[in-house]
Amino acid sequence: GARFIRRRKVQKYIDFDRTRSHNCLFNFVNGIRGCGKTYGKLKDDIDRYMKGKGRFIYLRRSEEELKTLTTQKSGRLFNHVQTEYEGHALWCEANLLHIDKEVCGYAAALSTARKLKSDALDYVTDIIFDEYVIDDTTSQQRYLPDEVTAFFEFYETVARPGSRDYDVTVWFLGNAISSS
């Protein structure tokens, strides 16, 4: 007789629940371009916000990278993930990330992060550092001088170690690159 093979639904983005279950403060997720790292992490953080589990920060290296994503009116950061949230409006403007009329997160540039004040970043539980790896074979972008120190200073501004009863988890998202 005929055999029927049941196919599993192919997921179009990374599910971060398993990675989160390891309970690491810093998580590095590298994969091929377009495999759904940013989409999956935005979905994860939006879902967590909607369940009352805190806000998030979307971090990029420079302000230039944020211009079309979160700074300009109608920033396009949420364009693709919006389809997951029928009946809700997701939008970005002036580096504030919104669900309907509420602020669900913030966008920041590591290059100017020293200007941020921790009290303005209320109840942040996740930081997404998107495109943390630079592929210098295809990009004109460069790492910031003393970038690691700048990141740790930014992290301490947000997390305020010892002053909160929760941890701030960091998600470093990067494209897999080969080096010769």
Kindly give the residue locations of the regions a language model identified.
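Phosphate/NTP-binding elements of NTP-utilizing enzymes
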Residues: A2-S180
